[in-house]
Amino acid sequence: MELTTFWFAVIAFLWTGYFVLEGFDFGVGMLAPVLSRNEAERKQVLGTIGPVWDGNEVWLITAVGAMFAAFPAWYAGLLSTFYLPIALVLVGLIVRGIGLEWRGKVHSSTGRARADLGILVGSFLPAFLWGAVFADLLHGSATAALAGGIFSLSLCVLHGAVFVALKTSGPVRSRARRTAMITSAVALPAAVVALSGIPGASASVSDWAAAPWLWACALTAMAALSAGIALTWRGRDGWAFAATASSIAGTGAALFGALSPAPLPGLTIAEAASGPYTLNVLTWIGLVALPFVLGYQAWSYWVFRKRLVAEVS
């Protein structure tokens, strides 16, 4: 395998991992006001992501850093083309981080309400805009961007609801399951539209038919999403979360597969890549660093694997 292909695959993996992990973070942030009825339940909901949300953002930093080093032309073109939405994503991430950190340090109801608003807005912006950016990048139309944004937003909400059901107990868990079932009414149709090709977009369904494995990824994503909804209805929270995570992973595989070999219009992977020496150095750094990052993430999720209960004040 050529190093350019290898690093494109690594970047696709990093972005997909980011969407899987931050997807439920965004969903929990948006659902916190819906799933909680009092301060104890609000802490219970936000506590599901408290130990892991900042670690999940490392995937974004790593993905963007790898793009900058391995494919500087792709990095520059993507950020310049989508400057405004990406700037709004960064604003959202900053506001969300401030809200999550600040909330535990304020004791007034007004301060907590402002922090909750920051968490909500800071979760909504990236959940919607990342889908819009990548859909526009793939299809090149405003209709595609809107559909992609709705799909990613609904999928994050569903993924977050399933995660809360997995990590909590009592009334919050029941509400999370109901919310997941309600959200599925939007997520499933949005998945069909986004994954099968949007009418009027520049990349037609026939383009996908030329690569059967892309169809396989898209169909796997839709099947996993359907399975996640069914498993949630049956109360199999762990398997439901694995299914929604697989749906996001399948979507990521289909997305980056469709972006290859031209991640930007008129720019191929080979043209966007750094020189052989840079790619060789990056490969050695990646082989040493990535196992530690993955190992630490796995360890942190294992340590905080237990369900949370609402504290009685």
Give the label of every model feature segment.
Residues 1-11, 66-83, 134-145, 200-204:
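Helix-coil boundary and interhelical linker segments in multi-pass alpha-helical membrane proteins
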Residues 26-52, 68-76, 101-112, 161-179, ...:
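Juxtamembrane membrane-water interface segments of multi-pass membrane proteins
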Residues 76-89, 95-152:
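Membrane-interface helix-loop-helix junctions at boundaries between adjacent transmembrane segments
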Residues 147-151, 280-295:
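Hydrophobic alpha-helical transmembrane segments
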Residues 1-55, 61-64:
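N-terminal signal-anchor module of multipass membrane proteins
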Residues 264-282:
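Short, membrane-exposed interhelical loops at transmembrane-helix boundaries
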Residues 126-139, 189-200, 250-266:
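Hydrophobic alpha-helical transmembrane segments in multi-pass integral membrane proteins
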Residues 141-150, 171-186, 208-213:
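Membrane-water interface at loop-to-transmembrane-helix junctions
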